[in-house]
């Protein structure tokens, strides 16, 4: 057989799909960012979709992906992550703090998270898998997070310029460790942007984080 450069074939495939169904919305999965630039470069997809795995397991990897996608899509395409939480946990409930921290980071960085399928939260690339359940508290919290993302989507997802912001805790008794992005364990990490003339500051709570991986593998 002949060697095939798969990312290059993405272009003709996507263009053929759009040509056949010009009235349909179109997206293609860049698994582990494979072919992301070629997919974005077609100008035929409605957003960029990244399924992230162990080779992109850290919160800083999410930041890197979003910056790259921003360039690939000429600052016009937004990013949705397929990121399966608590992947190695065999049964029980999702770990609520891990779920919400990952959501908070993704939203702050300008991305969003495909994490619900049908009537359940996704723990696997096999979407019907329901081995993990959402607690009632998590169900309530997720709705509030989505309400927040929807209400403030212009500030979260309209681009802007990243700013380095130094924060100082004025209450010495709190003894809080504050740092600017990238995140650190046992710290509150700030991430700031200037969006449409407004300064947007996110405070991401890593005070009790036991790792800097979004995956929270074992919950």
Please give the residue ranges for each predicted region:
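Glycan-processing catalytic domains of CAZymes
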Residues: 1-183, 192-193
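Carbohydrate-binding surface patches
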Residues: 174-219
């Amino acid at each position: 057989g002949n060697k095939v450069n798969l990312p290059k074939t993405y272009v003709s495939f996507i263009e053929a799909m759009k040509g056949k169904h010009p009235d349909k919305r179109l997206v293609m999965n860049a698994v582990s960012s494979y072919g992301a630039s070629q997919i974005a470069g077609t100008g035929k997809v409605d957003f960029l979709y990244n399924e992230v795995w162990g080779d992109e397991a850290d919160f800083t990897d999410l930041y890197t992906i979003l910056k790259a996608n921003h360039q690939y899509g000429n600052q016009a395409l937004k990013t949705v992550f397929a990121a399966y939480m608590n992947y190695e946990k065999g049964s029980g409930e999702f770990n609520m703090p891990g779920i919400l921290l990952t959501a908070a980071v993704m939203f702050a960085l300008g991305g969003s998270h495909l994490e619900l399928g049908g009537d359940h939260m996704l723990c696997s690339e096999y979407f019907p898998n329901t081995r993990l359940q959402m607690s009632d508290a998590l169900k309530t919290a997720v709705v509030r997070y989505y309400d927040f993302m929807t209400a403030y989507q212009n500030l979260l997802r309209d681009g802007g310029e990243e700013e380095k912001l130094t924060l100082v805790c004025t209450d010495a008794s709190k003894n809080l460790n504050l740092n600017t992005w990238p995140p650190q364990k046992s710290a509150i990490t700030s991430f700031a942007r200037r969006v449409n003339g407004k300064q947007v500051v996110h405070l991401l709570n890593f005070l009790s984080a036991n790792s800097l991986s979004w995956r929270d593998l074992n919950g």
